[in-house]
């Protein structure tokens, strides 16, 4: 067990270094000028070359790439993620302020899409070729070909603009202080973004689960169970669910990365102040410190999802736990 966790800790550290290096390399080759992006076009045009060079030096733009990365990595080891150029605040504070909104959004969407996708996949697979199966598959194919931002705009126009049931954006009511915001207010603003992110994430889970159910129903032991007189419901409950659970756990934990990517678009559409919106702001402004910090958080979430899948494997299938212990 000690070797197991030590191996994962080493992998996690190497992953963080690799993600940070890739982010620094991409931002360094970006055509966006951080000075121009942060001071504004009008101020940049009227600024002297000496002032531009002074700002570039102040923000570290004149420091060689490897030196900047080494300084950032060294500070990160001491718990300092740097200072955001766009928000003029420590990166850790910016991320902490927005992480709660993003985690609530992604957590709800992850749970809803996982449960709904698993149930629909099992039902469609158990009723293969029937009307329910055709409707579910058509629904999934339609969603799989629908852009997230377009679906978000459609939901926003119907439920917020036309019907007026929900607010058009943000995470709290406009003009209300943070101390006066209730849990009901925050939940009311969270419904539409979470609905959009959940709906777009259902398709892959449904189709994958359906195929696994079909494979199980065509297996020899299911034929034998039916020959003994077991009903369709008994076959699904006692044979399908047990064998479909492990692949479903794998897919759902791997879906964390897609959830985070989808949240970037959803937060932009609904003006929801989360990590996705901050990542877009950092990318357009050349804010390498904030962008690297958000990339590290997202990589940690994906790594945690894979680790969670391994742990759940051991819970669902003791044979996996034994093999991991021997490794």
Task: State the predicted function of each range.
Residues 60-118:
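An internal, D/E-rich "acidic patch" concept
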Residues 2-3, 95, 99-132, 148, ...:
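Alpha-helical transmembrane segments of integral membrane proteins
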Residues 22-29, 59, 74, 138-169, ...:
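Membrane-water interface segments at the C-terminal ends of transmembrane alpha-helices
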Residues 17-22, 65, 107-111, 154-155, ...:
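Hydrophobic alpha-helical transmembrane segments of multi-pass integral membrane proteins
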Residues 46-80, 270-282:
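Short hydrophobic, aromatic-rich alpha-helical segments embedded in or entering the lipid bilayer
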Residues 6-12:
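N-terminal signal-anchor/signal peptide hydrophobic helix marking the start
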Residues 16-67, 163-183:
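Hydrophobic alpha-helical transmembrane segments of membrane transport/permease proteins
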Residues 19, 23-27, 32, 152, ...:
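Juxtamembrane/transmembrane-helix interface segments of polytopic membrane transporters
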């Amino acid at each position: 067990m000690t070797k197991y966790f030590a191996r994962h800790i080493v992998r996690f550290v190497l992953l963080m270094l690799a993600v940070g290096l890739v982010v620094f390399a991409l931002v360094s080759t970006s055509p966006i000028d951080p000075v121009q992006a942060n001071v504004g076009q009008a101020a940049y045009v009227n600024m002297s070359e000496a002032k531009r060079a002074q700002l570039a030096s102040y923000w570290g733009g004149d420091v060689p790439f490897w030196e900047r990365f080494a300084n950032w990595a060294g500070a990160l080891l001491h718990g300092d993620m740097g200072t955001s150029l766009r928000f003029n605040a420590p990166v850790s504070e910016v991320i902490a302020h927005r992480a709660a909104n993003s985690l609530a959004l992604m957590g709800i969407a992850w749970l809803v899409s996982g449960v709904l996708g698993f149930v629909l996949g099992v039902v469609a697979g158990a009723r293969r070729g029937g009307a329910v199966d055709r409707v579910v598959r058509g629904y999934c194919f339609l969603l799989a070909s629908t852009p997230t931002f377009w679906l978000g705009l459609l939901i926003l126009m119907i439920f917020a603009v036309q019907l007026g049931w929900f607010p058009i954006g943000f995470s709290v009511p406009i003009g209300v202080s943070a101390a006066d915001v209730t849990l009901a207010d925050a939940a009311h603003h969270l419904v539409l973004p979470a609905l959009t992110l959940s709906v777009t994430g259902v398709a892959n889970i449904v189709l994958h689960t359906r195929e696994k159910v079909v494979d199980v129903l065509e297996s020899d032991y299911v034929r034998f169970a039916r020959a003994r007189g077991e009903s369709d419901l008994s076959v699904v409950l006692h044979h399908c669910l047990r064998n479909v659970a492990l692949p479903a756990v794998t897919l759902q934990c791997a879906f964390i990365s897609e959830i985070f990517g989808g949240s970037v678009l959803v937060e932009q559409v609904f003006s929801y102040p989360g990590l996705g919106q901050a990542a877009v702001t950092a990318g357009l402004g050349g804010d390498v410190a904030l962008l690297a910090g958000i990339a590290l958080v997202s990589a940690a979430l994906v790594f945690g999802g894979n680790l969670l899948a391994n742990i759940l494997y051991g819970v669902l299938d003791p044979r996996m736990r034994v093999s991991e212990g021997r490794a």
